[in-house]
């Protein structure tokens, strides 16, 4: 007896967004470690503020808007425009560690996705990365697989938002430290209070003017992290 394909797709989605999925997210704080080192982030409330800053700026205008755009482009077979998103999101990253971290995570996602699933566009993506025509990006890889699994846009946005924030929260909880139960409470609060607002914002954005918009403070923290002599994270 085999499972219904809809359930299988859901389980596949749960597998690839699990915190234990080996794509290297446990190695990155995306600048939050700088805030921790400066005692700007030191407890649960200050961590929530930092996570909201990341979610409402880089994650919203970067990953989530990229996923939204790819869901619009792929049904129209505008494949080259999807590869352009990979290049744009890479070039817009000013902080070297964060840019390279996203690239490594994206490349690892493409590699493992291709070992698990039979998706022609992900195979093409891997070839483009190998031939240095594309860089590799988590949002691009995830959007391609989500569409392959017939996941609807809103589910894809919520899932990517959750998996990214959950991984980052767990990393920060280790660094402060706060304890795993406190980390789970933070994730629960973010889901129930803020996720709807962030996902709904995606549908109000204009790709041409809003893609990769960011605020200086977060990128400065990410760039300062490059000169941190003792650190827990690669970014």
Swiss-Prot record:
Query: Which GO MF terms are attached to this record?
Result: nickel cation binding
Primary site of residence:
cytoplasm
| InterPro entries noted in UniProt | UreF, UreF_sf
Q: Which organism is it from?
A: Ureaplasma parvum serovar 3 (strain ATCC 700970)
Give disulfide pairs as residue numbers: none
The residue ranges crossing the membrane are none
Cellular location(s): Cytoplasm
Give a GO cellular-component term: cytoplasm
Q: What does this protein do?
A: Required for maturation of urease via the functional incorporation of the urease nickel metallocenter.
Is Acetylation a UniProt keyword of this protein?
A: no
Subunit comment: UreD, UreF and UreG form a complex that acts as a GTP-hydrolysis-dependent molecular chaperone, activating the urease apoprotein by helping to assemble the nickel containing metallocenter of UreC. The UreE protein probably delivers the nickel.
Q: Which UniProt keywords apply?
A: Chaperone, Cytoplasm, Nickel insertion
Entry protein name: Urease accessory protein UreF
Q: Which domain of life is it from?
A: Bacteria
The family assignment reads:
Belongs to the UreF family.
Q: Which HAMAP family match?
A: UreF
